[in-house]
C-alpha cells in the first residue's frame, strides 16, 4: 500500500519509503499544526526523492541546506505556509580542523575518526579536505562532543575550531570524452563513456544497474538527457555535457565528462 502511494518514484527501497512517509507526515503537520521540522543529513539520492515528493504534492514550503552553497549532503526543512527559514536556522555546525601540511589526511580518515566517536552517518554532512586544513559539517547536537573529544585523525594531531571561512576549494577533476552514438539510450552512451561494447553495456545495466541522477535503473533502453549524471559500479561517474548534432549517417554526436 505504501509503495503504491509513491508509484511515480520507481525502484524504492524500504528505507526510501520510510523517509517519504516521514516527510509526508511533516507536510501534514506543517499544514495543520504549523510545525517546522528538520531532517538529519540526507545524501544526494534522498534529497532528490524529497524534491520529487514535494513536486508531486505541489508543496513549496521546504528548503534543503548543507551548511554552504552546493553542498552534496543536506538537511531538509519543512515549514508552514507564510513561514520563512534562513540558513542559520538549520541545526548545522561547521568545524574546521587544522593540522600540519605534511599530514595527508583524507575524507575517509576524518569520517572514520567521527565514526570512532560513535557519531552516526546521518549526523555528518559534507567533509571538505584541503592542505593543512579541513572542514566538516555536523548536526549541531553532536558538534560539542566532536570538538571536545577529537584530537587526532589517524596519526595526525588536529586542532578544532567552530566555523568555516570558505577557504577550502575542491576542484573536481574531469576527463572529456566525445564521440557518436546510434541513439540516446543508456546502453549506447555507457558504451562510449566506458569504452566497452554495446552488448556488454546492456548486460551491465541489466545485471549491475545504472544510476541516473542518483536514481537506480536496470533498463538499457532508458533515454538519457543533456545535463544528466550517470554511473555504473566499477566504471565510474559521468555527466552528459551536450548533444552536438547529428552526422550524415544520423548518428548523434555527444560530449561527456568523466569524473576522475
Label for each model-derived stretch:
Residues 1-193, 216, 223, 236-260:
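Ferredoxin-like alpha/beta domains used as RNA- or RNAP-binding modules
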Residues 201, 210:
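Short hydrophobic/aromatic patches on the structural cores and recognition surfaces of FHA
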